[in-house]
């Protein structure tokens, strides 16, 4: 089951509803619906970027998850999880956070972002949550992330490698960008195929 977070994709909610608490509630509702409708047993979360951060946090907050697949998660501790807003100057991210928390919201990247998101990001540490939940976890990053710092990637890789059933897969995605795409069509197709096959194989192993 796939879901769009508030203000994203097919969601009809305003982007100001894009907060970690709302996203957590949305995931819980989706899992409940899936289990009631399809009678599923074990449940895994697959998340990309901010979705990967939320997937990392969710088991600690709500439980009931068997495995995680994290595609390029934005797992920097606290506000470092928002580093993509200005990857070259983190002080600018801190200034945006202060403004948003003081005024209730700010406009950036063409959307209105709630101060609540910055506060909840500041108070969250997804890699600490991964260590605590210690679930089977697949982690992938590409060779050209761009909007995620080398530090965030290295710290997250180290955490997943330390887990009893952690698996880090990097090589098939060396030519991809943060969205696992490439301007070269053949490379893009290979990235898509590798991501799907790697994820499916991992989930089959731990959900069967």
Residue ranges and their predicted role:
Residues 57-61:
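Active-site signature of alpha/beta-hydrolase-fold catalytic machinery across serine-
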Residues 47-51, 55:
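Gly/Ala-rich beta-loop-alpha elbow adjacent to hydrolase catalytic centers
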Residues 64-166, 171-200:
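The alpha/beta-hydrolase serine catalytic core
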Residues 45-47, 71:
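Short beta-strand immediately N-terminal to the catalytic nucleophile in serine-hydrolase-like folds
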Residues 17-36:
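Alpha/beta-hydrolase active-site loop
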Residues 33, 198-206:
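C-terminal alpha-helix
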Residues 1-12:
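Conserved alpha/beta-hydrolase
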Residues 39-41, 134-135:
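Active-site acidic short loop of glycosyltransferases
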């Amino acid at each position: 089951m796939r879901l769009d977070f508030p203000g994203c994709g097919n969601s009809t909610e305003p982007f100001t509803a894009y907060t970690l608490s709302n996203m957590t509630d949305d995931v819980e509702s989706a899992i409940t619906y899936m289990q009631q409708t399809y009678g599923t047993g074990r449940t895994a979360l697959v998340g990309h970027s901010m979705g990967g951060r939320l997937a990392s946090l969710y088991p600690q907050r709500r439980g009931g998850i068997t495995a995680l697949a994290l595609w390029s998660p934005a797992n920097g501790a606290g506000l470092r999880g928002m580093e993509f807003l200005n990857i070259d100057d983190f002080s600018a991210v801190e200034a945006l956070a202060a403004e948003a928390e003081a005024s209730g919201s700010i406009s950036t990247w063409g959307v209105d972002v709630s101060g609540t998101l910055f506060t909840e990001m500041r108070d969250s540490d997804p890699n600490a949550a991964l260590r605590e939940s210690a679930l089977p976890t697949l982690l992938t990053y590409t060779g050209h992330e761009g909007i995620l710092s080398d530090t965030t990637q290295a710290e997250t890789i180290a955490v997943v490698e330390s887990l009893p059933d952690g698996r880090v897969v990097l090589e098939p995605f060396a030519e991809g960008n943060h969205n696992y795409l490439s301007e070269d069509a053949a490379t893009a197709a290979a990235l898509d195929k590798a991501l799907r096959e790697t994820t499916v194989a991992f989930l089959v192993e731990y959900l069967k």
